[in-house]
């Protein structure tokens, strides 16, 4: 399955949330343990830049700097530029078969890299929205697709990428199920 369209949708919803960040909110804590909103936004910028760079880099771990995203005077604009670069890099169909190193996780075809980015975007979009207190409403089918992929990952937690699964009732939204599966409390405030 080509996850690029789902990733584009997730990025649009996340960009809408990011566009609402005010400078005075950058020091707020987020649902991501150890990260302020500034740190989380820097992570998103770093990931977008690094995923884009990985499409043309080699597979050696030193080929891409996964922490290269810096926020200047306008962090929202920095995010928008990095996101646009990511989308452009993953536009060609040929990128889906290209082997690329994704941070410490290993070497994957671009089709898997897009899927990883998609999940990261959906979850971190929720993190940003919760932090600044604005609605976050990605399509339920988009969230269900992300959850389906996540359920393939081991549930043995915590790991460097995911915290212990949070138990939620069966009748919560697909988004709440997803964020709970990656270790976030859907009721975080």
Indicate residue ranges for each PLM-predicted region.
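Extended, alpha-helix-rich binding/interface surfaces that flank or overlap catalytic cores
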Residues: 40
